[in-house]
């Protein structure tokens, strides 16, 4: 399963409070996990393993709160444990 950004959005990110910024990017990437951004109260303290099906591909699913300061570190941590 692969993903790519539309040409007009490649190398751009919207950062709340800063606007649209230029960033490095990849032309295409393999999707290997799903991060579901949920309300803080919906993030389980110790979650059971979860997955979701996207176009027949079963991927690990994690529920995180986007505005927790630790969210980027959590995403990196779970991504590093794949394979």
List each model region and its residues.
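Conserved nucleotide-sensing/catalytic segment adjacent to the nucleotide-binding pocket
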Residues: 1-39
């Amino acid at each position: 399963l692969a993903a790519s950004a539309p040409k007009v959005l490649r190398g751009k990110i919207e950062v709340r409070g800063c606007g649209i910024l230029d960033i490095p990017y990849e032309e295409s990437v393999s999707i290997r996990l799903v991060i579901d951004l949920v309300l803080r109260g919906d993030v389980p303290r110790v979650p059971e393993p979860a997955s979701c099906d996207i176009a027949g591909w079963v991927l690990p699913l994690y529920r995180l709160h986007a505005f927790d300061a630790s969210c980027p570190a959590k995403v990196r941590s779970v991504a590093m444990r794949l394979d």
